[in-house]
Regions:
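Secondary-structure transition motif
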Residues: 1-228
Length: 228
C-alpha cells in the first residue's frame, strides 16, 4: 500500500465532503505524439522497471515505436491518498472559542486550558484577525483530514467524459433544472471548471477545445491508515 498526496481546490474539497465527488481528471504530461495509432494500455510488469505503471501509446501499428507516460505520483488502484487542501494552523491563544468560551472542535474544553492548537480548513472553517490561509501544496501529511483509496486509473480524451462521469466529478447545475442535469448544461459546467485550472497561455494546448489526453482517477473515501 502506497500513501501519496493529491491536491484539490476548495470547491472540490466540499464536493468530496458532501459525497458528490469520486473522480478527478489530470493532464497527461507529456501529451502523446499525435501520430500515435493505438494505445497499448498499462504496463503491469516488465524487465524495464521504469515502465511499470506507465501507459503506452504506439506510434505505428507494428509497435515500432512506443511512448510511455506515467500517472501523477504514480497513482495506481489500491493507493491511499491524503488530500492537500487550503489550510491553517490556528493556535489556541488566537481563538475566542464558542459562545461559552470552549474550543469549537472540543466543546468540553475551554480554550484557556488548551495549548496544542488545531488545523483549520478553508472549505469548512473561518479564521480571524491577521491569520492567512496556507496554499494546499504546503499542507503537511499530519494535517490531512480526508483520505481516499484509488479504485481505478485509466487514460482517455477529455471530451469523452459522460454526464454520469461529470456527476462523479462533483459538479451540479448552477440553477434548478426540472427534468435533469442535461448533457449540455453538464458539459458547460465541466468545461468551465476544466478551463479554470489551465493557464491562459496553455488553453490552446490543454483547454477543453484542445481535447487533451487525461488521467481519470476514481476513488472512494476511506479511514486514515493506522500508524500514519
Amino acid at each position: 500500500m502506497a500513501i501519496k498526496p493529491i491536491l484539490f481546490n476548495t470547491e472540490m474539497v466540499r464536493a468530496i465532503l458532501d459525497g458528490r465527488k469520486s473522480c478527478t481528471r489530470r493532464l497527461v504530461k507529456p501529451q502523446p505524439d499525435e501520430k500515435h495509432t493505438y494505445q497499448l494500455g498499462f504496463v503491469i510488469d516488465s524487465t524495464e522497471k521504469k515502465y511499470v505503471g506507465c501507459f503506452g501509446f504506439g506510434i505505428d501499428e507494428y509497435g515500432g515505436s512506443i511512448q510511455y507516460v506515467k500517472p501523477p505520483y504514480g497513482y495506481a488502484p489500491g493507493d491511499i491518498l491524503y488530500v492537500r487542501e487550503t489550510w491553517e494552523r490556528f493556535e489556541c491563544w488566537n481563538c475566542e472559542g464558542d459562545d461559552n468560551g470552549n474550543c469549537p472542535k472540543n466543546p468540553q474544553e475551554s480554550v484557556l486550558n488548551r495549548t496544542c492548537g488545531c488545523y483549520m480548513y478553508r472549505a469548512t472553517d473561518e479564521i480571524f484577525g491577521d491569520t492567512k490561509w496556507h496554499p494546499s501544496i504546503h499542507m503537511p501529511k499530519e494535517a490531512a483530514r480526508i483520505w481516499l483509496r484509488v479504485t481505478d486509473v485509466r487514460v482517455e480524451r477529455l471530451q469523452d467524459i459522460t454526464i454520469d462521469e461529470i456527476r462523479k466529478e462533483g459538479l451540479e447545475p448552477r440553477f434548478d433544472v426540472k427534468d435533469k442535469f442535461s448533457d449540455g448544461i453538464a458539459r458547460g459546467r465541466f468545461l468551465e471548471l476544466w478551463n479554470s485550472t489551465i493557464k491562459k497561455s496553455d488553453l490552446d494546448r490543454y483547454g477543453w477545445d484542445a481535447n487533451p489526453w487525461v488521467w481519470v482517477i476514481e476513488f472512494e473515501r476511506c479511514e486514515k491508515p493506522e500508524g500514519v
